[in-house]
């Protein structure tokens, strides 16, 4: 163990000088352990990660926890290896911090548990799997218009408060209940309250036994928020590579990963690039995203919530993330204001899996017809606002009539929101979703009032709701 001393503390960035010309490798973990000698001092147990070499014997590091109480001259020990976190069965049902330490008060992880470093190379080119398979989510708007790919990367885009986290919670619920798969949840720079709620909900629903959770929340220093996504990814990689599982990796929120990088970038002495972001933005994102993939042994399907600053999709952070994604689910504030939940924009959401050779001809044609109908309705809205419905041709009136039913039928109740709405959630298989929309497009339900289509699951529930409203079906 080689020792050094703290020579400078700049918020979350700490400079350390080592003896005898020793220089720890980039990404090595350094430890500072200090017992308080009087009441004015605090106990310190801090991990630093080497980020830069300054000269022959000095390194600049990023702290993984608060640097409160740190003083120049304190002793630092080089561990000789990167941060390593526990992997395997011991992680299931547990909650960890960025260093892989349990924070759920359920006891320590056994000393003999396997630990893997959080910095690892992406799988080799020849190890990657190429076949495309659809992952059924049970959420109609997703399955019909922007289906998710097994082993793909999916982005949930949206501004503040439009429902990204609720959608992620529903996906965790549906995939655990219907597919029995293992999930890893990485909470990156989001609200601690939401993480706590999610943990308790998953405990109550029994999903927690199939899930590992890692948190580096809003109140933590940028070092923890930068690395917590890698901690979660390392746990997911073990299940993929060693156990051949299809794993789900949820990251909420990938924007905070970029944001944390930009917070320390200037302190590390880098010149800022566009909009003040770090110049290494694309590289950092690429290193994370390239490890999330399908291999010959198993797959990691990643669902990432992406906060869009001020609803500006051209901002470098969301724009850089876009290039890595197979499918995008865009959440739209206008739809949330109309009471359509999930507030997914059916025209802006995309997926490379929406192709006849992947989803089948019928599904593809129904999805395209739904999008055409909604697009035409959007074009007609200005005319309706100025001249009213009466000025439309009969054909356009019919399009508006059906588009409104489609728009409402794209909404549904969520299992995870039952306690707020008082309505049971619904899981709709893809086959049922395609059949329901096909029948609406054919005009089979033109006589049913549009309110009957709001927040229901299968098309049969629409008919049932209409009967309760006293409509002849």
From Swiss-Prot:
Keyword Ion transport: yes
E.C. code: 7.1.2.2
Cellular localization per UniProt: Cell membrane
Annotated residues for binding of ATP: 158-165
Catalytic activity as recorded in UniProt: ATP + H2O + 4 H(+)(in) = ADP + phosphate + 5 H(+)(out)
Topological type in the membrane: Peripheral membrane protein
Main subcellular location: membrane
Keywords: ATP synthesis, ATP-binding, Cell membrane, CF(1), Hydrogen ion transport, Ion transport, Membrane, Nucleotide-binding, Translocase, Transport
Record CDD domains: ATP-synt_F1_beta_C, ATP-synt_F1_beta_N, F1-ATPase_beta_CD
One Gene Ontology cellular component: plasma membrane
Highest taxon of the lineage: Bacteria
Molecular function terms from GO: ATP binding; ATP hydrolysis activity; proton-transporting ATP synthase activity, rotational mechanism
Subunit record text: F-type ATPases have 2 components, CF(1) - the catalytic core - and CF(0) - the membrane proton channel. CF(1) has five subunits: alpha(3), beta(3), gamma(1), delta(1), epsilon(1). CF(0) has three main subunits: a(1), b(2) and c(9-12). The alpha and beta chains form an alternating ring which encloses part of the gamma chain. CF(1) is attached to CF(0) by a central stalk formed by the gamma and epsilon chains, while a peripheral stalk is formed by the delta and b chains.
Task performed by this protein: Produces ATP from ADP in the presence of a proton gradient across the membrane. The catalytic sites are hosted primarily by the beta subunits.
HAMAP family: ATP_synth_beta_bact
Family of this protein: Belongs to the ATPase alpha/beta chains family.
Protein name as it appears in the record: ATP synthase subunit beta
Species of origin: Geobacillus sp. (strain WCH70)
């Amino acid at each position: 163990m080689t020792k050094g001393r703290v020579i400078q503390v700049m918020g979350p960035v700490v400079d350390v000088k080592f003896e005898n010309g020793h220089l720890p490798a980039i990404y090595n973990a350094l430890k500072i352990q200090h017992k308080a000698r009087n009441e004015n001092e605090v106990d310190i147990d801090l991990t630093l990660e080497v980020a830069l070499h300054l000269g022959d014997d000095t390194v600049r590091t990023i702290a993984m926890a608060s640097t409160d109480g740190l003083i120049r001259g304190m002793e630092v020990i080089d561990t000789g290896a990167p941060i390593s976190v526990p992997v395997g069965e011991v992680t299931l049902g547990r909650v960890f911090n960025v260093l892989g330490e349990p924070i759920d008060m359920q006891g320590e992880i056994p000393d003999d548990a396997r630990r893997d470093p959080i910095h690892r190379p992406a799988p080799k080119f020849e190890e990657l799997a190429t076949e495309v398979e659809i992952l059924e989510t049970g959420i109609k708007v997703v399955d019909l218009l922007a289906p998710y790919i097994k082993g793909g990367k999916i982005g949930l885009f949206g501004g503040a408060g439009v429902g990204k986290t609720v959608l992620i919670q529903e996906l965790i619920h549906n995939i655990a209940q219907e597919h029995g798969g293992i999930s890893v949840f990485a909470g990156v720079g989001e609200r601690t309250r939401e993480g706590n709620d999610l943990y308790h909900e998953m405990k109550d629903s029994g999903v927690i036994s199939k899930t590992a959770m890692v948190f580096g929340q809003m109140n933590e220093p940028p070092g923890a928020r930068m690395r917590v996504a890698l901690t979660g990814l390392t746990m997911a990689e073990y299940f993929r590579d060693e156990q051949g599982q299809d794993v789900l990796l949820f990251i909420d929120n990938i924007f905070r990963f970029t944001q944390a990088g930009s917070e320390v970038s200037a302190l590390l002495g880098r010149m800022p690039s566009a909009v003040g972001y770090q110049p290494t933005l694309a590289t950092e994102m690429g290193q994370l995203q390239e490890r999330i993939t399908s291999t010959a042994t198993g797959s990691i399907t990643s669902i990432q919530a992406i906060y869009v600053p001020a609803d500006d999709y051209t901002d470098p952070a969301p724009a850089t993330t876009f290039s890595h994604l197979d499918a995008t689910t865009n959440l739209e504030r206008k739809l949330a204001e109309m009471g359509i939940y999930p507030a997914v924009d059916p025209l802006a959401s995309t997926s490379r899996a929406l192709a006849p050779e992947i989803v089948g001809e019928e599904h593809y044609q129904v999805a395209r017809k739904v999008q055409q109908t909604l697009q035409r309705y959007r074009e007609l809205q200005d005319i309706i606002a100025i001249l009213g419905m009466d000025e439309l041709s009969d054909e356009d009136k019919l399009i508006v009539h059906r588009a409104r039913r489609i728009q409402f039928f794209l909404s549904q109740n969520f299992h995870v929101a039952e306690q707020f709405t008082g309505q049971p959630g619904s899981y709709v298989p893809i086959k049922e979703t395609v059949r329901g929309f096909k029948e609406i497009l054919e005009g089979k339900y033109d006589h049913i009032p549009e309110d009957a289509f709001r927040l229901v699951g299968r098309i049969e529930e629409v008919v049932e709701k209409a009967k309760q409203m006293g409509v002849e079906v």
